[in-house]
Every structure is written in C-alpha cells, then in structure tokens.
Amino acid sequence: MWMFLKLLLFVCSSWWSCAQASNCNATSPYRTLDGTCNNLQNPNWGAANTAYGRLIAADYGDGVKSPRKAASGADLPSARLLSMKLFGDEHVLEPAFTLLSMQFGQLVAHDMGFTSGSTDILPCCSEGKPVSNPVPRCYPIPVASDDPVMGSAGVQCLDFLRTITDCDADPSSCSNSKKAEQLNIATSFIDLSVVYGNSVEENTPIREFTGGLMKVETRDGSDWPPRNPNASTACVQRSPEDACYLTGDARANISPQMAILHILFLREHNRIAKQLAALHPEWNDEKLFQEARRINIAQYQQIVFYEWLPSFLPLPDNGGKRSLSSVLDHQYRADVNPTTLNSNAHAAFRYFHSAILGHLHLDYENRTKAGEISFTDHTLNPAILEAPCKYAQLSRGMATQSMGRIDLNIDHELKHNLFKFNAPFGNDLRAIDIQRARDHGLPSYNSFREKCGLPKAASFDDFTSLLHSPQDAARLASVYASVDDVELTVAGLFEKHIPGTQVGATFRCILLEQFHRTRVGDRFFFETSDPIVGFSREQFKQLRKANIARLLCDNTPKLEGMQSKAFAAIDAGSNKVLPCSSLPAVDLDPWK
C-alpha cells in the first residue's frame, strides 16, 4: 500500500469571495499574511487561494478541464514511458554550484506556489494496480509491463491526483465552457509565507504572541519549530519521538535540508525580534512581530534577487524577451499582476529537479566528509537534524557538496524510489512533473516558443539546432507523433543552455517573465521608495548587506565559517571559507 503525506491544508471555503479595495488599509506598512491588498486596485492579485496565472490559455483535451491530448486527439505517451525513454538517472554533478543553490530554489518555488490538493490521500492505485471506483480526481500514470524497473514488480500504474481547480471549488463559476484554472493555496509573493503561513489561521499556532517572537521549542540548547500535533500523518516517523515540525508550510518536513532552510529563517526572525525589543522596549508584541517579519522578508528578497537569481540567470541578456536588468526594476507598477504563472510553477521552475541529489553529505568544520544520508531514507522525516552535531554537519554539507547538473538526468532515488518508504517500489518525480503539466493543460512547447518570440519547429528536424545534441530530435520523434505534441516540461530540459546560464531560451523566457512580475508587481518589495511601506535610506543600506552565508552563520550553532558566496563552490582563492565574524552583517542600529 502506498504511503503518502497527509498535510494540514487551509483552503478558504469561500476563496472566490474577493477582497474589496475598500477593505484594504492603504496606510499599513505591513503586508497581509494571505497576500490580499498588496495591489490596492486589484486586492486579490497574488493572494493565497486564487488561481495560477497564464501566459497562454489552457489547452485541455475537452477544451474545459480534461488533461491535454495529442494533436490527433489521442492520449499523449505515458509520462513514465517518457521518463524512462528520454531521461537518464546518471549521477552527474555541477561543480560550480553547491547543493544549497538547488535547495534554496526549491524554497523559493514553495514560497510562490502550493498546488491545491496535491498532497491529499486519495489512492488511485493499490499495490501498483488501478483501484476500483477511483475518485474523479484520479489520473494515474500508466506503467508498461516491460518497464525495466517497475514492470518486474507487476506495477501497472503510479498514483497521481489532479489539482483542485476553481471549477471544483465553485462549479457555478465554470458555466458556459469556461476553462478550469488550478488553485494556488500559497501567496505568489517572495514573502516567506513558507515561514509565516498563508493566512491568520496558519500563522496563529506558530506565533508566541510575546516579544514579537515565532513559537519555538528549545532542546539541547537549540531552537526548533514546534512539534506538529498531527505528526503521525504529517511525517513518516520511525518512532513517536521523531521530530516532525509545524511551520508556515507543510512541506518543510519533505527533506532534512528543506527543513534546515525553514529553521534558518524562523531563527532569523526571532534573532531580529530580540534585537528590536532591546532597541525599542516600548514596542508591543504586534509591532515587534511585524517589524521583524518585514526585515526578515527584505533580507530574503535581497538574497533571492541579488545573490541567488543571478547564479542561474546572469547578465547579459543573450535571448528571450526579458533581461535580468528588467527583472531588477526598482519601481512598483500597479498594472503588473504578480500572480504565479502556471507554466513557471509546473514547468520552467521545475528544471531544478535535475539538481536534486539522492545522497546528502555531512561535513566537518574543515569541510572533510563526516558521512552521508539517503534522501529517500529521510523523506518526510527530518529527525536526524536533532541528533548531536548533525544539523551543523548537514548545513555545511549543503553549502559544500556540488548540486546535480541541470541536464537530462534525474537522480535514481527520485526517478524510481520517491516516497517508497517500506513499499517494494516508489514513484517517479520526472513522470509526476510531466503528468502535472498535462493535468494543468499547459500548451505545447511550440506554443511557448511562439509566445516568447522564438522560432517554432515545423518538423522534428527543426529541433536539431535547439537541443543539446543532434540525436535529441530523433529521440523526441520516437515518442511523439507530431512536433505540436512535444511538451514544454520535456523539451524545455532538452534545450541548449544559453551560455552562462543553467537554462535554455524557452524556460529562461518564462522564468524572467515570472520574476519580473513578482518583483515589479509587489507593492511591498524592499527596494520601493514608497514612504509608507519602504525603508529609510540608512536601513536600506544595511539590508543590502544581507547574504545567505551570514544567515547560516548567525543561526547555526557550531558553524564557525562559511564561504562568502555560499551558493557557489568553495575556492581556495576567490571563495574560500571565512570566519563567520568576517562576513558582512546587517546592523539594526538604523531601526533605533
């Protein structure tokens, strides 16, 4: 029997009842938890529990909501078949970047999107066989009898549930053949909703309501998120004592390294709140909480846009419609909708899945290897973090170990053993990505090429100049009947990388469009000059110093040093490990 994570999801029972501009406080310097009222003219733009955005209208099999079909009207090839025929599972590393770069990217992706219903437990397959009377949302992934890994085990299908759409939530809103739109239960903003939650209801259980602090539990001298009251269903525990955390995002427990980043920004919030309390003893809990949250988010935004994003989408602009210079636009525009794009969340931004590794290193302070753990052995069980020395060792390992190369491989553990636990077989992350894009009606690769102002392919021969190797066009032709069947999620990974970047032209177009909207459409973005929501000149100068290396140092006991560019590989010359005290730090004196 498959085991899946039962997560606590808050989905507004009346998500379609829009916030009104008249209910927004235009003079508040603080963003709401659910993202409403960021845009005062369109208060629901970017808010939690609203539909993902679109660059191109959905392409459904029935024109309304059924998964995308081939141009002929037939079903597209099995997502598992494509995973096996087109993608390898070789262990290829990207020596220029650390695993921290991949993991931080996953945190950002979670911050901007949480697909509604994606973690529900409604089995479509039982022991690898289709269930009788499946629920309507079932869309299992077929597995061929000659599958070289799962076929011998008699596996016929892999579990997959369709995303909840606006039509599911409110059928009356989808009359007259309106296309269904999938719901995002996270805010679309770069706002640390993964730490603070996407609603007051999610935030309340994780706040201390004293001194502006987030709730923590102290064990062995370190602060940890509170234990999840539903640990037996939220995590896969080996014993009732295993740590399972309650955070602003239920996916914090997915892996130890994801949990580390959640804990990092949780501890940073409390570190800031304590400093502000010392500077302003007259401030009450709410003021301290909101100011600490505001600073924490600003530091995070500085890191995302100026330290992390340039590592895979660097200047200069060598193609596509958006350059990074346009992403780093300093002025808010009320006419820009920041809503997370479906094609970004469920295709372009998933390119990072190639960089995930199946084994995670633990490192000593001198960066020699202390050991390693299996990703699948610790999926949904971050308990190892509280074992002696392991939190610091895994943090060092994450900032030292090379991430996987962005290529046509995906780690064996994620391709065959995802969520395996004690079962004889697991799921396939690449197949899930392909199936999810179909579920969401993402149009063809050719359609997105055209949208991005790039040449379309009229024949498979036209793919030759676009892809990694001349043989790749033939590989696509062997599984797709038409060039217009080729999927964005698949071909985007086959594209030649633009020199100096980690992506091809089509994914780059989508990613840059998304981050442009995310930045320019956020009224509270930390660079704004708006006197109501912006920072003073002296405060802003300090926020510019924020960097991931110093945050790791300040919030990781027993960590004594870090390279200044922690997303990049350690280099004895230009990026050597430095004492934590020598790394730039944000000084809160301007907040006096």
Swiss-Prot record:
InterPro entries xref list: Haem_peroxidase_animal, Haem_peroxidase_sf, Haem_peroxidase_sf_animal
* Uppermost EC category: oxidoreductase
Residue(s) at site: Transition state stabilizer: R251
User: Which reaction is this enzyme known to catalyze?
Assistant: 2 catechol + O2 = 2 1,2-benzoquinone + 2 H2O
Q: What is its EC number?
A: 1.10.3.1, 1.11.1.-
Single GO BP term: response to oxidative stress
Q: Which domain of life is it from?
A: Eukaryota
Q: Where in the cell is it found?
A: Secreted
Q: Catalytic residues per the record?
A: H110 (proton acceptor)
Role this protein plays: Inhibits noradrenaline-induced smooth muscle contraction in the host, probably due to the oxidation of noradrenaline, resulting in vasodilation. Exhibits peroxidase activity.
Q: Which family does it belong to?
A: Belongs to the peroxidase family. XPO subfamily.
This chain belongs to which protein, by name? Salivary peroxidase/catechol oxidase
